[in-house]
Swiss-Prot record:
Listed GO biological process terms: tetrahydrobiopterin biosynthetic process
Entry EC number(s): 4.2.1.96
CDD domains according to UniProt: PCD_DCoH_subfamily_b
Coiled-coil segments: none
Gene3D superfamilies: Transcriptional coactivator/pterin dehydratase
Highest taxon in the source lineage: Bacteria
Annotated organism of origin: Prochlorococcus marinus (strain MIT 9515)
Lyase in keyword set: yes
Keyword terms, alphabetized: Lyase
Swiss-Prot/TrEMBL catalytic activity: (4aS,6R)-4a-hydroxy-L-erythro-5,6,7,8-tetrahydrobiopterin = (6R)-L-erythro-6,7-dihydrobiopterin + H2O
Top EC group: lyase
Protein name stated in the entry: Putative pterin-4-alpha-carbinolamine dehydratase
Entry annotated with the keyword Kinase: no
Assigned protein family: Belongs to the pterin-4-alpha-carbinolamine dehydratase family.
Amino acid sequence: MKPHLLQNEELKELIAKIPGWEIISNHLEREFNFGDFIEAFSFMTKIALICEKYNHHPNWENVYSKVIIKLSTHDLGGITNLDQKIASEINEIFEK
């Protein structure tokens, strides 16, 4: 998938398609909370496999049972269709 920057209208529609995510500055961000560190780390491991598949990696933080994920395409300077796809897949993993 070749990434392209999402424009204002696309960004507005994006939030409805990926519940829980926010647009902050030039990236997508979402916080996920789990019961403990093992659950949080397991979630991160599943996400890592998706990110490797697309060769597109998030900025993220993990503090015990909390994971904060930030997605943007640095080369293009903002949020792209690839960030949207990965955010959607992350939501699917979280909902399982």
